């Protein structure tokens, strides 16, 4: 019944599919077997097709998740089954095509997440498989050094070295936060800003973190005894900055008792215990009775040196410049100084190095330096020893030194523990060196013995570039931790089981194994302490910022000028942000172009004439100058000029220097008159007040030169310092920008300075706020439309306009108004006084909702960008839900992109099951887009569309193929489809391989193929009885609809036989050698053999005539005929023509011994009465010496041919063997004995009895007539369909077979010639016509299902 699952799936019949599973599910007793008994049939839900795929594999790959859910609800489903081609599980396939919903369902079925550890045939788990596919899309190769933005800690936390607040030891990696310098009321920007981590150093008692901040960028935690943490504290649980270092630190190094810090100016600061002079400070700088430096102190010995690196040992320290290296502290022979001085209190230069030092590590008894020339020098035993990089190539088969790896052993990093030295190469390989060989070596040993004894052993040799090591770290017990280029983290551990120690893994050797650390991805650096504390620096993916070319406040105010249409629209220039959290800035050239100057000042001077008959709706100030009149806004004049603010707010008439006169002051309008100043100067002044830009017409025409002096007079009078500074220059210069700052400063103090200028009152839930309708309308389309509606209802603005927004609060609306009066971006929300992230998040989305409601589009983008800064693995689900609810499309899109880049994390513990279905669908769509470029070989809609445009017939062919396959799967014959799979697990199945034949005498064959590809089928398959059969070719899903032929070994000359005569002492093994089974190759073999063995063909036709008498043929016969008997001489003659068979060769064709092989899906069981097949021919079994074995089978199989259509009646006789075998045919041994007379007589007697038994199964006349009628209809319908599809170009005469039947009554010679011509014609046309498989047979003119 397994074929019905595939049939319902191909028909997309989900109801029938589910019903079949439910009927079977109630009877399943053993869930792991995956089948049930019903009417003698088995539903094997984990059954594979010919291509080694289960229904679950196919449904997952084709994104048919309704079928996946139904399959996973079945008790017998096995989600760990791997396909036979690549070893992919269903989870592999789901991840490969981006089907996250199916992946979530599969992980839900696997609570232990065992499927995440199953590897395919390339040794890749699902995550490694995904990482390799997306290596260039999601995980690009990063350049070093890398700045991480997240720090994770795990392992032991005995001395509070992990920086976790509660002091617990986390079982899995846990996020570590740095507490920055904060005031009593920190802002949200200070609390929730993202860290930028450069380095982490850990010792047994304390840990130090280095960030990228400009100052105070060193954070410490741990045990403070001895001054090791830089301030007077016994225990510090969290990472806090160290005070006392005013410059930015670029490198840190720690030991058990002291710490070192290197600033960007080359100075070294040290603090901690100075018991052996390891701090590098002179004796007079420390107290003799208490040699402890609590706070960081600069080493004065290096004040004239530019230090580029340093390292701290247990009781000493080293530092180096670009030319020399210096050491100080306790001298045990590791300082590189030949003098036997016990303590070196101040830095001392080490001599003898031929190349500058670029890296160094310290242990208790040795100092190892990496030189610029890639040499490794060790200071130990008061000597300098060079360690040649001699790799032990015999320790692993993976380590080979090929000619193309000239830079393979370039050292990138050194790492040392007490007894081990690890070397990380530029290629990403890790090697180990045993330090005991170096430390126990006598200083008088010869150099030659040193070179031969030192060997580096490989620890990590990768098989793909994405597994190259990026960073490594040691612990005291030699536990190695490393991270790779694909962002995964691995830890080397001692094997716990003996069987594991003897096993071999791609990434482990000897007693150690590498385990992947869960819940860690995108790791760029690892650190470890001697006590077993581990740190992982993670560089999380940062989505692209949300920015738009927004309108600056200057642009909005410039639009109020009447001649704004004459100014060209400048294309903004994108300035990249200063840091990764910043937003790109759109800048533009503020100076007016020469063309604009000509448009404004030439002819009738449009800058003046444009003010005629122009009045802005919110203008409340009128300026008269001569005959010209200018309209302006009181709030802008007050914000730009403190002098005008005093005049306009004093509410009385006044004059200044006989130039400016205040004539009228009311709440709604004011009038200003300017004397002795040309109107053009006033126009230029207003342009500056509104745009911060100075127009210089005097550079265009000299007649405008007096304007410069008048403009300078107004600038000094109105207290405009920035404008007055640039006017004296002869060259055109623009004043400093001050418009935005002036307006924001006035808004922050508007209740004191300019409350009277407010013309809008906003009624809120807990109070009211005043604002300017001008700015509200410039920022929001909502307020612009509202004020326009109010102006249509009332012709004057004498009273303040009231806006009712009672559902909003004053706190939230104040933030909105702050945006209205400024150009602040994400800084707008950094001043929120929220100490809790969830409260801050709620406030942010409330503002986002207000911006969306009131159409503050720019504020909406800024709020989304501010929220995007705090997107991480923990906040992603919340941000996705809220952004979708508040219509934050840009933020939601970035969340989806972030989820795709961290999909491994969310899949690892099936965290995607917590997502909403809509989110899961969107993430899957985005992931599919990212995967589309990486898996171009898979079918996609784009590729399919291009193929259909080029060849439209492909769709018809595909539909035809699926139709034929469905028809076939619903037939009873299809139950044998799966036995012919090329991926069958057991040896007796029809898989092309080299095998030996099991004979009746009990000889067991030997096989060189022991792999089991389908364990379930191997367990359920019963042993085969002793019968010889030939491999048949079947048609399966995915193959093209062409003629599928089952070629007997007679057609290719092959045979397998056995001689068991009375005088035979040993059985003879028949051997056949064939190529791999292929339907196309078998066609070639058939054509070849028919053309090269003419005599055999005639004998074949002669035997066919004899067989026709015992076979019911619908086209020309309605009764049974007795078989033609052969004499003993004829049989001996045929036997003598056979070529001897080799006893030792092993055949290359699969043979089943026992009952008839019904694995051919196109064959029909012949023992059933009335069984009908749509084939065009009858498959023949062996005769001659193989007839004995074939007779025991008692049945035959049907093969398709195009010449005739027949019905199998179970006759054991079939085509004769070819008398002239092909070069591939089997042969009998030359000394084989002929059959005896008694055997021949027994054979003939059995043939007669067999024919009598078969003659009893005669069909009635009614059944024969029905089959003839249906056959005629089927031939006509098949020819018509073939002609429509263009497969058959010429119409065939359907009555040919009938005429051939009548021609059989002609003389024997004529009959033989016609048969020869017809067989050759049928062979030539054998490859052109497809096979049409009928769904039904006729009964009284109607169709019925095939049984």
From Swiss-Prot:
RCC1 repeat extents: 148-198, 215-264, 265-322, 324-372
A GO CC annotation given for this chain: ubiquitin ligase complex
Example GO molecular function: ubiquitin-like ligase-substrate adaptor activity
Gene coding for it: btb1
PANTHER family given in the database record: BTK-BINDING PROTEIN-RELATED, INHIBITOR OF BRUTON TYROSINE KINASE
Ranges of biased composition (kind: Basic and acidic residues): 1013-1023
One Pfam match: Ank_2
Origin species: Schizosaccharomyces pombe (strain 972 / ATCC 24843)
Bias (Basic residues): 1336-1347
GO terms for biological process, alphabetical: protein ubiquitination
Stretches with biased composition (Polar residues): 1208-1237, 1297-1306
Intervals holding ANK repeats: 51-81, 86-115
InterPro entries for this protein: Ankyrin_rpt (IPR002110), Ankyrin_rpt-contain_sf (IPR036770), BTB/POZ_dom (IPR000210), RCC1/BLIP-II (IPR009091), Reg_chr_condens (IPR000408), Signaling_Regulatory_Domain (IPR051625), SKP1/BTB/POZ_sf (IPR011333)
BTB domain ranges (all copies): 619-698, 758-829
Alphabetized UniProt keyword annotations: ANK repeat, Repeat, Ubl conjugation pathway
Residue segments, region Disordered: 1006-1029, 1104-1139, 1193-1237, 1286-1347
Function noted in UniProt: Probable substrate-specific adapter of an E3 ubiquitin-protein ligase complex which mediates the ubiquitination and subsequent proteasomal degradation of target proteins.
Protein name: BTB/POZ domain-containing protein 1
Pathway participation: Protein modification; protein ubiquitination
Subunit structure: Interacts with cul3.
């Amino acid at each position: 019944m397994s074929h019905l699952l595939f049939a319902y799936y191909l028909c997309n019949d989900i109801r029938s599919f589910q019903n079949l599973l439910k009927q079977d599910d109630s009877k399943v007793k053993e869930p792991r077997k995956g089948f049930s008994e019903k009417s003698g049939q088995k539903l094997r839900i984990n059954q594979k097709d010919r291509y080694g795929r289960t229904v679950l594999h196919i449904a997952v790959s084709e994104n048919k998740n309704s079928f996946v859910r139904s399959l996973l609800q079945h008790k017998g489903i096995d989600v760990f089954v791997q396909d036979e081609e690549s070893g992919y599980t269903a989870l592999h396939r789901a991840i490969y095509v981006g089907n996250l919903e199916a992946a979530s369902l599969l992980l839900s079925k696997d609570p232990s997440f065992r499927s995440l550890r199953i590897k395919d045939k390339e040794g890749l788990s699902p995550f490694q498989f995904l990482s390799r596919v997306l290596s260039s899309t999601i995980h690009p190769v990063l350049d070093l050094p890398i700045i991480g933005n997240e720090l994770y800690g795990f392992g032991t936390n005995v001395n509070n070295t992990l920086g976790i607040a509660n002091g617990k030891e986390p079982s899995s990696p846990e996020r570590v936060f740095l507490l920055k310098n904060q005031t009593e009321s920190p802002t949200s920007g200070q609390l929730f800003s993202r860290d930028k981590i450069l380095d982490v150093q850990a010792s047994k008692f304390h840990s130090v973190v280095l960030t990228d901040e400009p100052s105070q960028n060193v954070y410490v935690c741990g045990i403070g005894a001895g001054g090791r943490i830089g301030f007077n504290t016994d225990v510090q649980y969290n990472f806090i900055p160290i005070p006392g270092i005013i410059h930015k630190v670029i490198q840190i190094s720690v030991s058990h008792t002291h710490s070192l810090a290197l600033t960007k100016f080359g100075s070294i600061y040290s603090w901690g215990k100075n018991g052996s002079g390891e701090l590098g400070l002179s004796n007079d700088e420390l107290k003799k009775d208490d040699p402890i430096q609590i706070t960081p102190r600069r080493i004065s010995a290096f004040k004239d040196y530019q230090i580029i690196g340093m390292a701290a040992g247990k009781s000493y320290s080293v530092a180096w410049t670009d030319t020399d290296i210096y050491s100080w502290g306790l001298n045990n022979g590791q300082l590189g100084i030949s003098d036997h001085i016990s303590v070196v209190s101040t830095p001392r230069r080490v001599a003898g190095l031929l190349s500058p030092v670029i890296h160094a590590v310290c242990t208790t008894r040795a100092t190892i330096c990496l030189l610029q020339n890639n040499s490794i020098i060790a200071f130990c035993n008061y000597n300098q020893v060079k360690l040649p990089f001699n790799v032990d190539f015999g320790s692993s088969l993976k380590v080979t030194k090929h000619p193309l790896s000239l830079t393979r052993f370039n050292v990138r990093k050194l790492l040392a523990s007490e007894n081990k030295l690890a070397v990380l190469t530029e290629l990403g390989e890790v090697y180990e060196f045993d330090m005991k060989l170096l430390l126990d070596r006598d200083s008088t040993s010869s150099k030659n013995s040193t070179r031969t004894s030192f060997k580096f052993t490989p620890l990590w040799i990768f098989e793909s570039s994405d597994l190259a090591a990026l960073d490594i770290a040691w612990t005291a017990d030699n536990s190695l931790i490393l991270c790779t280029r694909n962002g995964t983290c691995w830890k080397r551990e001692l094997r716990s089981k003996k069987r594991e120690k003897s096993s071999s893994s791609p990434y482990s050797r000897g007693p150690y194994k590498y385990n992947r650390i869960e819940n860690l991805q995108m790791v760029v650096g690892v650190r470890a302490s001697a006590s077993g504390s581990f740190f992982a620096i993670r560089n999380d993916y940062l989505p692209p910022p949300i920015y738009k070319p927004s309108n600056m406040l200057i642009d909005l105010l410039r639009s109020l000028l009447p001649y704004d249409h004459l100014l060209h629209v400048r294309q903004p220039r994108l300035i990249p942000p200063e840091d990764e959290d910043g937003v790109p800035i759109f800048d533009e050239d503020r100076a007016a172009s020469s063309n604009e100057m000509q448009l404004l000042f030439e002819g009738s001077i449009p800058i003046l004439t444009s003010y005629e008959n122009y009045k802005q709706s919110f203008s409340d100030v009128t300026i008269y100058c001569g005959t010209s009149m200018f309209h302006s806004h009181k709030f802008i004049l007050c914000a730009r000029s403190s002098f005008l603010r005093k005049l306009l707010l004093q509410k009385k008439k006044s004059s200044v220097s006989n130039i400016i006169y205040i004539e009228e002051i009311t709440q709604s309008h004011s009038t200003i008159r300017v004397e002795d100043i040309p109107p053009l100067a006033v126009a230029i002044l207003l342009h500056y007040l509104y745009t911060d830009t100075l127009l210089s017409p005097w550079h265009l025409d000299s007649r405008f030169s007096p304007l410069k002096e008048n403009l300078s007079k107004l600038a000094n009078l109105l207290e405009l310092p920035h404008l007055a500074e640039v006017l004296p220059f002869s060259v055109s210069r623009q004043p400093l920008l001050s418009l935005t700052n002036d307006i924001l400063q006035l808004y922050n103090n508007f209740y004191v300075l300019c409350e009277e200028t407010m013309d809008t009152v906003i009624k809120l839930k807990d109070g009211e706020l005043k604002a300017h309708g001008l700015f509200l309308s410039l920022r929001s389309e909502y307020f612009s439309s509202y004020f326009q509606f109010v102006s249509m209802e009332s012709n004057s603005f004498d009273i303040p306009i009231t806006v009712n927004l009672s559902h909003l609060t004053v706190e939230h609306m104040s933030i909105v108004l702050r945006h209205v009066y400024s150009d602040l971006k994400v800084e707008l929300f950094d001043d929120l006084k929220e100490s809790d992230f969830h409260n801050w998040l709620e406030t942010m989305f409330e503002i986002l909702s207000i911006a969306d409601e009131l159409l503050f589009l720019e504020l909406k983008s800024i709020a989304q960008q501010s929220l995007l800064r705090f997107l991480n693995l923990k906040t992603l689900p919340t941000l996705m839900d809220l952004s979708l609810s508040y219509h934050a499309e840009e933020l939601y899109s970035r969340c989806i992109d972030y989820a795709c880049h961290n999909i491994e994390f969310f899949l690892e513990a099936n965290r995607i099951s917590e997502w909403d279905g809509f989110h899961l669908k969107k993430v899957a769509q985005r992931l599919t887009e990212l995967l589309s470029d990486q898996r171009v070989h898979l079918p996609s809609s784009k590729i399919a569309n291009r193929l259909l445009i080029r060849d439209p017939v492909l769709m018809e062919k595909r539909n035809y193929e699926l139709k034929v396959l469905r028809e076939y799967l619903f037939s009873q014959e299809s139950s044998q489809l799966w036995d012919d799979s090329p991926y069958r697990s057991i040896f007796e199945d029809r898989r092309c391989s080299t095998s030996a034949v099991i004979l009746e005498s009990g000889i067991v064959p030997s096989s060189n193929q022991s792999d089991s590809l389908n364990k379930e089928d191997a367990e359920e398959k019963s042993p085969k009885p002793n019968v010889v059969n030939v491999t048949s070719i079947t048609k399966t899903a995915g193959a093209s609809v062409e003629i599928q032929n089952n070629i007997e070994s007679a057609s290719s000359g092959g045979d397998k036989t056995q001689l068991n005569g009375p005088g035979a002492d040993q059985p003879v093994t028949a051997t056949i050698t064939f190529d791999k089974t292929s339907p196309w190759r078998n066609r070639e073999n058939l054509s070849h053999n028919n053309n090269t063995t003419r005599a055999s063909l005639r004998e074949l036709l002669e035997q066919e005539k004899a067989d026709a008498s015992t076979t019911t043929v619908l086209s020309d016969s309605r009764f049974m005929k007795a078989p033609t008997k052969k004499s003993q001489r004829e049989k001996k003659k045929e036997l003598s023509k056979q070529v001897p068979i080799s006893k030792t060769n092993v055949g290359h064709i699969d043979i089943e011994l026992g009952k008839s092989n019904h694995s051919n899906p196109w064959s029909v069981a012949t023992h059933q009465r009335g069984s009908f097949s749509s084939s065009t021919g009858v498959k023949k079994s062996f005769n001659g010496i193989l007839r004995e074995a074939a007779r025991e089978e008692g049945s035959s199989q049907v093969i398709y041919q195009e010449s005739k259509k027949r019905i199998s009646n179970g006759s054991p006789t079939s085509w004769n063997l070819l008398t002239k075998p092909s070069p591939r045919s089997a042969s009998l041994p030359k000394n084989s004995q002929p059959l005896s007379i008694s055997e021949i007589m027994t054979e003939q007697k059995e043939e007669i009895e067999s024919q009598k038994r078969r003659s009893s199964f005669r069909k009635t006349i009614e059944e024969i007539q029905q089959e003839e009628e249906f056959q005629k209809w089927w031939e006509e319908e098949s020819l018509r369909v073939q002609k429509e599809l263009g497969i058959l170009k010429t119409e065939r005469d359907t009555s040919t077979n009938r005429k051939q039947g009548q021609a059989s009554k002609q003389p024997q010679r004529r009959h033989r010639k016609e048969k020869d011509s017809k067989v050759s014609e049928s062979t030539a046309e054998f490859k052109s016509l497809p096979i049409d498989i009928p769904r039904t047979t006729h009964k009284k003119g109607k169709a019925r299902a095939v049984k």
